[in-house]
């Protein structure tokens, strides 16, 4: 009789543990799905912000403006951006600006200063240094290439 009570108790205990396990697993699945949904929404938001920034590359983009668009603090914004795109917003922006500048210098007869302004660089000396560092020659030298 004592053994019977222990077996009944064990089955009840096992059943309770199994129920608890199922409840915990169910909650975990729901929170994971919600997390994926919010990650997906956040990724979509960042894709829109990135598209806006890269489409309007000639405009001055500040960290504050980008953070406000995402409604995030600076560190959160940069962390998310890096996770989604494996880069920083300013690196993406400057890379696109540089490609546009190389294209304009190669295909248009424009002064270097005008190319810099058209590509969103407000400072000619910064543009020239950045261009030389990344292309191995000055913008003027690039424009004279055959």
Residue ranges and their predicted role:
Residues 3-4:
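Short, small-residue-biased leader/transition segments that mark boundaries at the very start
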